[in-house]
């Protein structure tokens, strides 16, 4: 048994491995899936990305918090992660944009974290055994009946939590009501964006291209899409298992039947894949970072991309397949593991649709794939 006291914080994995550190952010108990992020920067964007909802994020970069927390870089209205794990938190925020420390931001939003653990050993453990359920415990959460809880009790609490496979999470992060992000300058196109966990930078990137974006709740019916008469339909990123997204999948099929130009990213790629009859599966430890290569097979070009996904669409590079909406093609894959990173419908009689598994809007990350928004613009103009 690891010896610990009330001044400790523990990260407990479902396989019984326990890491001891100190509290960081709020104290208490947090349960979720432990995943690791290899990005060296952009922790504020990571923490506020709705795709991380229900997950305990482990930072591989050894020092976190150097630039504090500002009022401009949030990708949603709040911190989305279930818990946070770092090696060496910065003792001081050093940025003219900072309004508070990372520690203060976590504490004010009730996010339970742990610092001072060997994140390198933890990441190797998750890489070899796969991501798994975990819990962060500190303060009163370390107690059971007034005494320090034994390790076995903490492990049992973790094992009682829900698994990510089969998790229906997008409903917890979608907007409760429709809203509009206006175009910058004169609006030239209108997009209906289905919010299953959309990041703030996505409608911002569209606005820069003269697109007015109507962000819609995940349960929006096709009748509302028809009322808007959009030039295009966008499927956002989001959390959870795509196998649970039956509503968005059915809506996507209705959009394809109406031949509305469609573009999807991340979770949206998985939704489109399911709408086209493809299966999805859970990756061993996922792709989470801002320097992940992707090959576009039509051009044999490589883009360095920002990614955050634990599930993927079934398929192989260059694979062609039949769908009710026209011939389909696996357009992009990751050279690291062959994972599908993009889909498209092809041919003059096919519905105009394509998607990618990565994040062309970055935030944080490289902008190699920003031209995909321009492709979407061209697809919409062709459909006018």
Regions found by a protein language model. Give the residues of each.
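Amide-donor transfer/coupling interface in amidating biosynthetic enzymes
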Residues: 4-5, 41-44, 50, 64, ...
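General beta-strand structural signal in soluble alpha/beta enzymes
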Residues: 13, 36, 58-59, 86, ...
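Conserved phosphate/anionic-ligand binding catalytic regions in large, soluble enzymes, centered on
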Residues: 56, 60, 121-122
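Catalytic nucleophile loop
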Residues: 116, 232-236, 256-277, 359
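Intrinsically disordered, low-complexity, positively charged segments
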Residues: 3, 7-45, 50-52
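Short glycine-rich anion-binding loops that position phosphate/pyrophosphate groups of nucleotides
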Residues: 237-241
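Short hydrophobic/Thr-rich beta-strand motif most characteristic of the beta2 strand and flanking loop
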Residues: 212-218
